[in-house]
Amino acid sequence: MSYSFAEKKRIRKSFAKRTSILPFPFLLATQIESYADFLQADVAPGKRKNQGLQAAFNAVFPIESHSNNARLDFISYMLGTSVFDVKECQQRGLTYASPLRARVRLTIMDKEASKPTVKEVKEQEVYMGEIPLMTETGSFVVNGTERVIVSQLHRSPGVFFEHDRGKTHSSGKLLFSARIIPYRGSWLDFEFDPKDYVYFRIDRRRKMPVTTLLKAMGYSSTQILADFFEFDHFTLAGNKILFHLIPERLRGELASFDIVSEDGKVFVQKDKRITAKHVRDLQQANLTKISVPEEFLLGKILAEDIVDKETGEVVATANSEINETLLERIKQTQNKNSEISTLFVNDLNYGPYISQTLRVDESTDQMSAQVAIYRMMRPGEPPTEDAVLALFNGLFYSPERYDLSVVGRMKFNRRVGREELTGSTTLSNEDITDVIKILVGLRNGRGEIDDIDHLGNRRVRSVGELAENQFRAGLARVEKAVKERLSQAESENLMPHDFINAKPVSSAIREFFGSSQLSQFMDQTNPLSEITHKRRISALGPGGLTRERAGFEVRDVHPTHYGRVCPIETPEGPNIGLINSLALYARTNEYGFIETPYRMVKNSRVTEEVVYLSAIEESQYVIAQANANFDQTGVFTDEVVSCRHKNEFTLASRDQIEYVDIAPAQIVSVAASLIPFLEHDDANRALMGSNMQRQAVPCLRAEKPLVGTGIERVVAVHSGTAVKALRGGVVDYVDAGRIVIRVHDAETRAGEVGVDIYNLTKYIRSNQNTNINQRPIVKIGDILSREDVIADGASTDLGELALGQNMLIAFMPWNGLNFEDSILISERVVSDDRFTSIHIEELTAVSRDTKLGTEEVTADIPNLSERQRARLDESGIVYIGAEVEAGDVLVGKVTPKSETQLTPEEKLLRAIFGEKASDVKDTSLHVPAGISGTVIDVQIFTREGVDRDKRSKQIIADELGRFKKDLADQMRIVEADAFQRAKRLLAGKVAAGGPKKLAKNSTITQEYLESVEKHHWFDIRLIDENTSLQLEQIKDSLVQKRKLFDLAFEEKQRKLSQGDELPPGVQKMVKVYIAVKRRLQSGDKMAGRHGNKGVISKIVPVEDMPYMADGTPVDVVLNPLGVPSRMNIGQVLEVHLGWAAKGLGKKINEMLISQRDASEIRDFLSKIYSDNGKQEDLVSLDDKEILELAKNLSDGVPFATPVFDGAHESEIKHMLKLADLPESGQTTLYDGRTGEAFDRLVTVGYMHVLKLHHLVDDKMHARSTGPYSLVTQQPLGGKAQFGGQRFGEMEVWALEAYGAAYTLQEMLTVKSDDVNGRTKVYESIVKGDHKIDAGMPESFNVLVKEIRSLGLDIDLEQH
């Protein structure tokens, strides 16, 4: 087994018993693939599939004029390249997008010609607006900020059957309904009412009898009855009535007469219930006709019209109920042996629902039914024949107005039981009748209703599909405008671009990416929060559910979530269950349904074949769990295996198993799979744990978790935070900001530059103001392969996710300071900067045009102290590296103010000192309250045409210098490579002449080549023409590369020197970035990975902390009472295993210090790595690599305990024993203050602790004098408004209870909204006279005004 560059530096010991045969899929694939399918940018126009942009264009084009004289056809589209790259767009506040151009053909027909003849064809490329591009990590940059389009889980198009669970009617009767949901178009509902009539609704409007719809579709009453019912046949034979017997239909009926055969044998006596035995007897007797009394016909319903054969008169119409009178008329008019057909109905399983509905239906024929539907859809409009037909045909039969979609058709056909899964995306008459038949069948007790929360009935709409819908909506708006203008095409000699206005398209796209509910500000706190945000699935958003209306069932975990949606990770609060996360191995299929992988089982043997199944397909198979036992050959060892079948957990024999899970972690999401010992945690706490990991703030120095799950490396690499080598090669140069790699020849294609330069991200602000900083982990000369990690990012350590720090934990109470989840922490943790984090604040100063003139950025600010001015350069902008505090000036700016009338004193001063500065006011950018730190970056943006200041020019020069350095490095390596190849080519060849008087026919030696300058090597002439040609090619290639580099430099120079796009009226914008160092302090929120969270109560001196027998003080003291009731035992197991990890590291460190032999260290390592769990291949590492591995392990051997497949208690004890630690995981602790041992043994060990993004610095705040509410004159609330503390109703009660009358009066008046009183308080404090004169609170005046607004005049009596 081969290790990657970073893996071999620190191998994580895994306790996994089962290795997954399927590597982890790319975690951002859903987003990236969906958008790639939407754009199809890399696909040739002729080969593009009908999806995404292509499908949207195809749906709208061709557009024809109303007169059909002109037509606009779409040929293809082309995406340009973005002017700025991602980083430039973020800096400049632009959207990272590319221009979209469509090639369109205008065809004008000849009006005068007798048959359609083309008169003129014009073809042109038309600009269609900008389409945002996705970054490599699956996000979008919109107006300079990174955003994510969250995938939506919505109800799949198709047909659904359900009932009201007996809630509608007081009797509790189940009312069945069916709904046909299209992707686009009108919803069609069918429903039963309590009287068992069947109705339909279109778009939830007024209900109408379903037979109205059937008649509108062209069915007659007789056809409807024939389609929905089976018939009973009777023959009138003289005085006898013969019934054509089908014995099965009589089952369960009460015999109203003796059923007798022709020979007089009685099969069933009168008033007896007909049983299955009777039915069998009748079938065996082969009795086909029996004589029935006339009463048997009474109440039956006629299936067809009965016509008098002599007169042609209709004696009885179809669907009439036979009564005595009607029966007499029928007997009189019908001939001997004539047949009557009636509907076969009963109360049990063949109800007369459609027949009853037909009776209440008032429409008579097709037209009257269509008119009734028209009146329902368009009340008040006169129904003309054309309008009626157009509306009815447009509802469900027109592709423009109605689209069931490919998914909808597949789901529809599958539900109505058809073999064919494809077909028309509009409805047909057969579709509608099939749905009604199934609905009637449900009422008759046949079939089952659908579960709408089943993942086979919910599909994912990813970013590509959502963007396509918006683009299509924009194009539809364009279509209307184009249709209007096309009629003028010929007369005005217009070109295609004159018709198409790109505004509606680009505004639809801009609105979607900028302000849609599904376009969210990316959570960038740490790499995990980024990756989780992109894998999120929301049931909210346009076309989805709303928080208020979503019930318990939708939010609940469903059996089909298994392996598709994580049952653990979901927010707490109103969105619980509506926002979910994709499971680890899940992906979406072509239809948008979530699939999960399984290994196929053949003949009780597990194969290597992997099959992805959706929830629809899965239920029919028997699927075993991933922890099922099987031997080396894959044969199940147990006779009976725990498995899932039809969404139920069950036991099955091993020969019935068809599939087996791919991995134990299959059911959970990325965040949940990062929790070690997840299987020992209560689900509620695991939910909090997975959510809190996303809030972990990156620490100054990231530290890998000693106890992980083995997926840390995958998350770090897939999130894009850690830098990967694009191609293999040798590290040529490394510094803190860039890595230069000389690429292996084998990986360099012809014409490519054989050098990769990685400019690392240094101290960049994230969306959540945390710090994104990358640091190299390679050295010069390191040999790398493709995909190797070469630099760590925020919260990553040697290419592994490292969200927190490993702390030495003791579970014990300590003076009540860890009461109720409080956390006690050692001062050493703070002094060692273990949890110190850097937060970057961005502050912006804007210089605008005002009516009185332009605001000016300058250092010449009135009344500015020398100390403040010293921090500003001559342009008035703060220096990089300046330490600034609240209130300091960052950007000096003055605004012109209107000239006021001067007082005589001011005139005199003006005359003496000649001061003219008073006509401007200071509007400088100051550091806001609560922020102090170091200025780390300044960016200046200047409008085109405005002169740049000195600082701006300096920034551009520095940027160009960095770019030039990159190009120089590239050129250096390219030249070295070219000269190397030239040297190999020339050495030993026969020359025809050359520099330094090289003699003809002399052999070129190494010494000669070294004596000549390298660029003169290309002047050497050779006898061999072939070699000369190769030398010429190397020279041409080098010249070409130089030209390319010069062009790249010129392009960069042009970009930087051109003006910036700024909002209207803005002349200059200065952004200042301040790095704020946040050290750990009381009030900060900390958490483990098991939902064990708390707030720091006190930071205790090291010498007072409890310590172990060897003198090691613990870092953190947690309350043991926080464990049993929360049932998150995982944290205790983590602490035990963490202690073992640290103990083993300590032993390895001792071996290194005593300079033990590499083979001895190798033996000890193999004891750790090869005893149990996953076997590691230490043999493949040489001694040097073993020593480097041991050095990296000396701080602790990292363990991986994968979820549901982790370390057992015995394995933890074994590791503790190997580390020479007590197997109980407990030890004696001593009180740091007294030195006495505590009575009981204490659980001690290492836990990975996170600092959460709920810092006390961001929350703590005190008001001095601040803003007041306009109406009530009370202080505002909240830190953002510099507000006060609310003194509410209950607090007033408290003071009343204490009888603190004066305090209460103070609170309700001068400290709140007594405007005059609070001014007087200030005066009395200044005078030193501490007297309070309380007046009328403003809120009382507001109350008086409110009462007056109700029409009651209220006044206070004046005394």
UniProtKB/Swiss-Prot annotation:
Molecular-function annotations in GO: DNA binding; DNA-directed RNA polymerase activity; ribonucleoside binding
Single biological process term from Gene Ontology: DNA-templated transcription
Originating organism: Nitrosomonas eutropha (strain DSM 101675 / C91 / Nm57)
Keyword Nucleotidyltransferase: yes
SUPFAM superfamilies the record matches: beta and beta-prime subunits of DNA dependent RNA-polymerase
Pfam families found in the cross-reference section: RNA_pol_Rpb2_1, RNA_pol_Rpb2_2, RNA_pol_Rpb2_3, RNA_pol_Rpb2_45, RNA_pol_Rpb2_6, RNA_pol_Rpb2_7
Keyword entries, A-Z: DNA-directed RNA polymerase, Nucleotidyltransferase, Transcription, Transferase
InterPro entries (UniProt xref): DNA-dir_RNA_pol_bsu_ext_1_sf, DNA-dir_RNA_pol_bsu_external_1, DNA-dir_RNA_pol_su2, DNA-dir_RNAP_su2_dom, DNA-dir_RNAP_su2_hyb_sf, RNA_pol_bsu_bac, RNA_pol_bsu_CS, RNA_pol_bsu_protrusion
GO CC terms in record: DNA-directed RNA polymerase complex
EC number: 2.7.7.6
Coiled-coil region: none
The protein's name: DNA-directed RNA polymerase subunit beta
Subunit structure: The RNAP catalytic core consists of 2 alpha, 1 beta, 1 beta' and 1 omega subunit. When a sigma factor is associated with the core the holoenzyme is formed, which can initiate transcription.
Function: DNA-dependent RNA polymerase catalyzes the transcription of DNA into RNA using the four ribonucleoside triphosphates as substrates.
